[in-house]
Amino acid sequence: MNRQLRFAVAGPEILAAVVSGCSSGNKSAPSSSASSSSTSPSASSGGAAGTKVIIDGKDQNVSGSVVCTNAGGTVNIAIGGAATGIAAVLSDGNPPQVKSVGLGNVNGVTLGYTSGTGQGNASAEKNGNSYKITGTATGVDMANPLQPVNKPFEIDVTCNS
């Protein structure tokens, strides 16, 4: 239960960090780092149209923008707004490896996946600038914290280049 409780507490923080970090494309702060990694945000002009998020067989009807950022060998994908957004962090390979997914609150349960925790699973496919991320997210229902919640999910999203 300790691992599940840590995930339930860390899940919203991961989601908020990814969504807010990926949606700050309008800020222009100079970088004093000599890092060779590049950051290239890409916001979809049509919002989340064409983006599909399905959790436990139900379309989540996401709205808002899609923001993708490549940095340090990862692709950060944020869909929707900071409060209700969906976020994913993938490796920049092909096929990409899923590092984390934050699905937000679904029916009172904060759902997500983080690689290496032994909870849930996720895989991704890349086709050009489009990603399909599938797996099983986990969460804790505080009404019954000893029973973990597992929900299948699918995310189809296109990042503009």
UniProtKB/Swiss-Prot annotation:
Keyword Transport found: yes
Annotated lipid attachment (N-palmitoyl cysteine): C22
Region: Disordered, residue numbers: 21-49
Covalently attached lipid (S-diacylglycerol cysteine), positions: C22
Low complexity composition bias: residue spans: 21-46
Statement: the UniProt record of this protein carries the keyword ATP-binding: no
Keywords: Cell membrane, Lipoprotein, Membrane, Palmitate, Signal, Transport, Virulence
Protein name as it appears in the record: Lipoprotein LpqH
Organism annotation: Mycobacterium avium
